[in-house]
Amino acid sequence: MIRLAGRLAALIGALMLPAAAAAVAPAAHQIRVRIEPDTRFLEGRDSIRFDAPRAATLVLSARFRVDSLVVDTRRIEVPDKPADGFQRITLPAARRIDLGWSGTLAPLDQNLDHRHTLSYAEPASGKQGTFLPSGSGWYPAVDESLERYSLELDLPADQRGLVPGRLVEERLAHGRYRARFEFRQPAEGIALMAGPYRIEERRVRTAAGSEVRLRTYFHPEIAGLASGYLDSIAGYLDLYERWIGAYPFSEFSVVSSPTPTGFGMPTLTYLGIDVLRLPFIRATSLGHEVLHNWWGNGVYPDYARGNWSEGLTTFMADYAYRERESPEAAAAARLAWLRDYAAMPPGDDAPLVRFTSRTHGASQIVGYNKSAMLFFMLRDRIGEAAFDRGLRAFWNAQRFRIASWDDLRRAFEHASGQDLAGFFEQWLDRTGVPELRIADAHAVATGAGWRLSVTLAQGAPAYVLSVPLAVRTAGGEITRRVELSRERGTAVIALPAEPLEVALDPELRLLRRLAAAEAPPILRDAMLAEHPRLITPTADAAVEAAARDLAASLLERAPAERKPASMQLVVGLHADIDAWLAREAMASRPATLAATRGSAQVWTARAGDGHILVLVSVRDAQSLAALSAPLPHYGRESYLVFEGARMIERGTWPVKSWGQVLH
């Protein structure tokens, strides 16, 4: 699986493979490719072989010219190519196809921000780096087919490059760097990376007894980070081999990109230079990418029936690290998932079974967070031991196969002895999440203690739920699970001491819509807003221009003036913001964000009519311009303080920690 923080939406049609493709023997490519980054020239030859004669359609970018095409022993004339997009070359049944092609790659755009990188699908090259995404048509891919390959790469002597797979040999001679790679497992495509890299290598013996080659391909300015990254990779391999099973490949590399990318693919991850510099990446995102070599690159999602791999990887990586940190950190992670979901406009929601890739914030909330919460609830239901048995059984049965949510369900059913059809159906096939509330709660004294009656209510059609209820009594806190399968149900709980308060799911163990008191406004509310509005209460033209740039960077939808605003982004100098708040009779600047602290303060608030406000108060236009790049990365925060582009303080507004008081 080739992932760009998921997959490129523009390439889904080209890369999505039906399950039937698994039944057809993969095409075998023998590719030789030469790249000249100075001129962005690419020249390649590919010999494609099939186990038996078959018709095939080749997909190649229209930016390339087909120099030669031979099908078995017959030379074929190629139809005129389109001006842009892809050439689709349909060929008769054959065992072998030989094709030569050449052309000019797109220029490397180092000005792309993270969001635009998600939708950039061109094969690009330059002195600082070359990246040819698997679905960009840089080589003649066989449509609707898995592929095996051998690839020989030819680059100038000051460049190094790689593709996913096993490094067979590399050499430096006659002013050229040459390397040969093999990928013998069925793959969904081939991506190629190159750059002025310095390579560091380490060989490790894994828990399963295999020798794995670990490498970093880093630009010179971050070469000093290599040793720490190699240490971390080795640790993650050990963790996941013990949890799931043997690492399925012979190597793993971390490769730096001059643009803010976030790709994961078999045997490697491709991350932006600035991302790799971040101190927390080794403890978070790196493990996520290593784990994808089991889920996504070792077992392939059946995209036609939903991508389960991002949620499972998020649960076993990002969330698992928080769980190992502390119960409080794990609960904070679950709160962040549910708070993100609460920020998503209802029209952006979709059933989890339809998720294929991350293309925007809403798809990440569904495909990563909602999916990870499903696995958390599943583990709660069947127990950790059965959950882990199910994971290992799924891995052993589906290794290098295309697998669906149904295959996962069957593995967990066998491991737990439970029928999980209803559980998976309601969380996969339905749009939305339960909206739960305590409709009534009262207690009466009995001879043996107290009897608490709690009536729970949810919307229609009802979910089948096991709802945690926490009761604070005069003698301490007691937790019970209450089964709810209708729109309304009453549970009676016997207690040894007088109940004082009752709370619905205070530990956030259910996927549900948070109540308003549980979901303080966060920056994500602005980023995903359906009808955002930009307000600039300033006479400074430079501030107005920087505010428009910030809105373009931060918001997923362009600000509009004609529709009623669901969110207002108010941007100005410190004095302008204070005056606007007073004029609109809004609450003044929070005490925690004094105007003298930092060059910029950002905070969220809720207006009297319920819509969200995001206020950005800055020292000057330069301080505002500095926010465009970093601010979109802090969607889960309620307030932030910046000094230039550096975040110096952040936090979320407090939430109500308990539930209904009993009288």
Annotated model-derived regions:
Residues 140-287, 310, 315-318:
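Hydrophobic helix-coil surface modules that form long, contiguous segments used
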Residues 66-72, 420-421, 434-505:
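Beta-strand-rich binding/interaction modules
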Residues 520-663:
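Solvent-exposed alpha-helical segments and adjacent loops
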